[in-house]
Design a protein with these regions (language model features):
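Short, acidic Gly/Pro/Ser/Thr-rich loop/turn segments
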Residues: 54, 66-67, 140-142
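Core segments of cupin and vicinal oxygen chelate
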Residues: 9-62
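Histidine- and/or cysteine-centered catalytic micro-motif in compact active-site loops
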Residues: 62-64, 93
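Vicinal oxygen chelate
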Residues: 2-11, 48-51, 69-176
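A broadly used, surface-exposed interaction patch
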Residues: 59, 67-70
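Hydrophobic pocket/interface hotspot
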Residues: 16, 20, 88, 105
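Short Gly/Pro-enriched turn/cap motifs at secondary-structure boundaries
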Residues: 35, 79, 113-114
Length: 176
């Protein structure tokens, strides 16, 4: 089952809009505006991620909400963990699409980290909130042994580390 939407607070909605609509290609389709139960009010913006209305990413622009003056919008920084721990991963249908996105990100002035994880291939950059954003395509299959190892890892730390990524590349922005 897929999720309907992921919602997060935004510090700079104009920058978020530029990133998610102009660079990622998600379409702003809806805003809900109204009071927040604890006080203040908010705009809740919804961006369509797929060609239909089944999957969205949403952002809250908060106004006069108590306790939200110095809002930390990076999920990882708010949790006190490294940037790559809490991240947003979107599906890429194939490697061609992934490469097109990588090129578009670079042309938009973004640095891109590309990783071949041996079973999936990913590109990463950061959004204006400071969140790590990933596009990923599954390139491998899962075996019974993969599942057994995953189940064992739930209850044991006495297991071998995974193989290192097949490749890791940093692609610098190519703004013209």
């Amino acid at each position: 089952m897929a999720y309907h939407h992921l919602a997060m607070a935004a510090a700079d909605m104009a920058a978020i809009h530029d990133f998610y609509e102009t660079i990622l290609g998600f379409e702003l389709v809806k805003v809900e505006i109204g009071p927040v139960p604890d006080g203040g009010w908010a705009k809740h913006f919804f961006y369509r991620m797929a060609g239909d209305d089944s999957s969205f990413i949403a952002f809250w622009e908060l106004h006069e909400v108590p306790g939200c003056d110095n809002l930390e919008t990076s999920l990882s920084r708010a949790a006190g963990v490294p940037d790559q721990i809490n991240h947003i991963a979107f599906n890429a249908p194939d490697l061609d699409n992934l490469n097109q996105r990588k090129d578009a990100w670079q042309r938009a002035g973004l640095n891109v980290l590309e990783v071949d994880h041996n079973w999936c291939h990913s590109i990463y950059t950061k959004d204006p909130n400071g969140n790590m954003v990933e596009f990923c395509v599954t390139t491998g299959t899962f075996s019974t042994e993969d599942r057994e190892l995953a189940l064992k890892a739930l209850t044991s730390d006495q297991i071998s580390h995974s193989a290192p990524p097949a490749s890791i590349e940093i692609h610098r922005a190519t703004v013209e």
